[in-house]
Design a protein with these regions (language model features):
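Intrinsically disordered regions, especially transient/low-confidence alpha-helical propensity segments
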Residues: 2, 56-58, 170, 221
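Non-catalytic pre-domain segments flanking phosphatase-related domains
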Residues: 2-35, 43, 198-229
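Functionally constrained cores in energy, signaling, and assembly domains
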Residues: 12-18, 30-32, 70, 88, ...
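Generic structural signal for short, solvent-exposed loop/turn connectors between secondary structure elements
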Residues: 19-27, 52, 143-148
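Residue-level detector of alpha-helical segments with a strong bias toward transmembrane helices
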Residues: 22, 44-48, 162
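Internal hydrophobic scaffold segments of catalytic domains
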Residues: 25-39, 156-168
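Alpha-helical substrate-recognition element adjacent to the catalytic core
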Residues: 27-129
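C-terminal cap/substrate-recognition subdomain and adjoining C-terminal extension
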Residues: 97, 101-229
Length: 229
């Protein structure tokens, strides 16, 4: 019994030392990125999802077809390379579900030119439904990874970062995605103006020019030119 307790104590000390080395190195940041509409323009993956795989959503199909339909959002990729080349730790947190997640990891590895592995630097964090409303769960992983920064396009990304005590940075969603996916972006700028959604498309330019969003988040100022035909 005493021996077992001793080993548990030693293991705990080792875990604390390792955690401190990984997460508290001087000058090293832990930087997180959303995937869809942040790293990848993946609209066409979802638009090409076969009808018989839509309800429920076949995430295995989605995670297996980025190579066919997704395009890199180059300003974000340049930023990822900047952090990576300067020795900072890079993590990806997506609201996608995990089936065939290794295919997404392999795609990112090939395109970003450094190893991306599930549950090592790629994490799947699908939303949870509570009383009929779907809520983000990304803040749990952000806390566990002790992120310093999180880059994402959606309102839920900003909320998750704030809940986790992480500095949020908004990556400006391309207009083609705003039109396709109005909700979860400054409320919903393509719906009719309402108390719930008070901001118009014109209001976005005011936010963009001020480099601050509705949650007090920073706005990354280099915009993507858009998908290639």
């Amino acid at each position: 019994m005493r021996l077992s307790m001793k080993f548990r104590f030693i293991f705990k000390v080792i875990a604390i030392v390792y955690s401190s080395f990984l997460f508290a190195q001087n000058g090293i940041l832990n930087v997180g990125f959303d995937i869809d509409d942040t790293v990848l323009f993946s609209r066409d993956v979802f638009l090409n999802l076969p009808e018989d795989k839509r309800n429920p959503m076949d995430w295995g199909w989605i995670n297996s077809h980025d190579d066919d339909y997704s395009q890199l959002i180059t300003p974000t990729v340049d930023l990822i390379h900047f952090f990576h080349k300067n020795g900072h730790n890079i993590f990806f947190i997506t609201a996608r579900s995990k089936p065939k997640g290794k295919n997404l990891a392999n795609f990112l590895t090939d395109k970003l030119m450094f190893p991306v592995e599930v549950n090592k630097n790629l994490f799947f964090s699908p939303r949870e439904t509570i009383k009929g409303t779907r809520y983000t769960t990304k803040q749990r992983i952000m806390k566990r990874l002790r992120l310093d920064l999180f880059y994402g396009d959606a309102d839920t990304d900003m909320i998750a970062a704030l809940k986790a005590g992480v500095h949020p940075v908004r990556v400006v969603r391309h207009k083609a995605s705003i039109i396709s996916y109005g909700p979860n972006y400054f409320g919903n700028t393509i719906d009719k103006i309402s108390p719930k959604n008070p901001f118009s498309m014109e209001d976005l330019n005011i936010f963009y020019s001020s480099n601050v969003g509705i949650f007090g988040e920073s706005i990354y100022p280099i915009f993507w030119e858009g998908p290639q035909k």
